[in-house]
Every structure is written in C-alpha cells, then in structure tokens.
A protein has these predicted regions:
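Short, Lys/Arg- and Gly-enriched loop/turn segments at beta-strand edges
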Residues: 42-50, 89-99, 237
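A generic structural signal for residues embedded in beta-strands
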Residues: 36, 84-85, 227
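Structural signal for conserved beta-strand scaffold positions within catalytic alpha/beta enzyme cores
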Residues: 6, 51, 154-156, 209, ...
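Short, surface-exposed secondary-structure boundary micro-motifs
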Residues: 39, 87-88, 230
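Local cysteine-cluster metal-coordination motifs and their immediate loop/turn environment
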Residues: 112, 190-191, 212-242, 270-275
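Ferredoxin-reductase
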Residues: 1-80
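Short Fe-S-cluster ligation motifs
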Residues: 235-239, 243-280
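FNR/FR-type flavoprotein reductase catalytic core
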Residues: 68-216
Length: 280
C-alpha cells in the first residue's frame, strides 16, 4: 500500500497527490509514468510522474477527474493508501545536450510538461514555456512554470487570463521574434499536439509529443496503447510515451481514443453512485 501524504485541488477538476513510494522516487525521471489502482477492484490507469522527491521518497501525481477510476482515486484522503502504484514505466524524456527548448502544455498535460521543463532548466537549457487552458478557472501550475522558464506565455481560449488564443499562436509569435529551438516538446490533448506539430513543421522545427492512450498493463503485453508511428506499430508504454511528432498518425490515435467513451461514461456514473457523488 502507498500512503497519500498530501492532496491539493489545483482546480475544480484536477487534483495533485503526493504518494509515499521510495523505490519509485529513487528511479523516476521526467516523462515516465505510473500504473495506479486506487482499490483492489479498481481499473488500472496510467498517470505520468508529475514530480518526485528522492530524499523524502515521494512521487507526485496530477490527474483530471473524468472517469470512474479517477473519481475513486479522488475519494481517497491524506493518510489513506493507494492499492497499487507501479513504476516507473516507459522511457524518460531525452533532455541532454539541448540548449534552447520550447515546452508546450495544454490543460492537465501541463502536469506532464512541468517536470520536463524543470529538468531542462536545471541542466542550464533556455526554456520557453507555453501553457494553454480553456479559461482562468482551469489554470494550473503557473507559479511552478514561472520558476523554471526563461519566458512563459499563458493562453486561454476565452481570454479570461493571459492572452486570448491557442498555444500555436504563441509558438508562432516566439519564432517570429527570432527564437530558434533545438526542440519543441508538446504535451496535451491530441488535437492540440497535432497542430503544434504542424506549426513546428511550418517553421522547420523538430518536435516530440507525449502520447497517453488507453493503457492496461503498462508493459507491452495487452496492446491497448498501440499507435502508428512512421508507418509502424508502436506501444506507448514501452516504446514511448515520447515520439517524434512528425511520425505520429494523430488521426488514428484520435479515432482510437473515442472507442471506449460509452463504457467510460457508464463507469463514471457507477463510481459516482457508489461514492454518493453527483455526476457533473
């Protein structure tokens, strides 16, 4: 069992938890993920490592409350324990030797982008960060990004905070201002990453994307997280989650991402009923 030592609501639908997991904290690197199961009879879900403290032996996870399992996870309180917490899994993001990078995060994807931006900053890399949200009330981790970014652009769809617009507009502006990046790292909704990659292609920039499809075992056995990358089948859990943005078949990934929505909706309703929570 893995004890919850801290729990914070970052916005109405996103929660941060700090979990006691010394062996994972000792080995975790930015870009890797954990397979989490809140209760013995819960489904397994992948959550990317959002931070770690090797001395304290803790690992941070940040998740959006969208389905049955995340509702169950969010029902746990400080002092209680998560049933399964397996990792670190996947390949760490390669950050060595980079001198100037733009990190682009969207929504809860910013939780994945943050430890990568931190690692780059600690290595002396110039980091420009662009984060996007639908509105001000969904904003997360602004101060944390400020602390590890040489420049930070905050975008909101409705203009309620930062600059009104999408993250690709900010990337266009940064390049127009004379910035040339060794790499653009983008993490967020599939449609956002698809258009960030297109923007990078327009400017001749290399990009990598973090793919977080449906995942069950996290070791490549089930095939649930398969993707087409460069015309070949890859598995996000063992070959990724980072891939060359130019090679990912985003349309296929988006189509696969909608396959289980009816089941997810039923699981969400069942979890809400079980925990006496209102379905929103």
């Amino acid at each position: 069992m893995y004890k919850i030592t801290e729990k914070v609501a970052l916005n109405p639908t996103v929660t941060k938890m700090v979990i006691e997991a010394p062996l994972i904290a000792k080995k975790a690197k930015p870009g890797q993920f954990i397979i989490v199961r809140p209760f013995e009879d819960s489904e397994r879900i992948p959550l990317t490592v959002a931070g770690y403290d090797r001395e304290k032996g803790t690992v941070d996870i940040i998740f959006q409350i969208v389905g049955g399992t995340t509702i169950e996870l969010n029902s746990l309180q400080v002092g209680e324990s998560v049933h399964d917490f397996v990792g670190p899994l996947g390949r760490a993001t390669e950050v060595e030797g980079l001198k100037k990078v733009c990190v682009v995060g969207g929504g809860v994807g910013c939780a994945i982008a943050l430890p990568i931006a931190r690692e780059l900053h600690e290595q002396g890399c110039v980091v420009h960060s662009v984060v996007g949200f639908r509105s001000k009330d969904l904003l997360i981790l602004e101060d944390e990004f400020k602390a590890c970014s040489d420049e930070l652009r905050v975008m909101t769809d409705d203009g309620s905070y930062g600059t009104k617009g999408v993250v690709t507009a900010a990337l266009d502006e940064l390049v127009a201002a004379g910035n040339q990046y060794d790499l653009v790292i983008t993490i967020g909704p599939l449609i956002m990453m698809k258009f960030v990659v297109k923007t990078c292609q327009k400017h001749g920039l290399k990009s990598i994307v973090s793919m977080n499809p449906i995942m069950i075992d996290g070791t490549g056995m089930c095939g649930g997280c398969r993707l087409t990358v460069g015309g070949q089948t890859k598995f996000a859990c063992v070959d990724g989650p980072d891939f060359d943005g130019d090679l990912v078949d985003f349309d296929e990934a988006m189509a696969r991402g909608t396959m289980y929505r009816p089941f997810e909706a039923r699981a969400r309703e069942a979890a809400c009923n079980l925990l006496n929570q209102e379905v929103k």
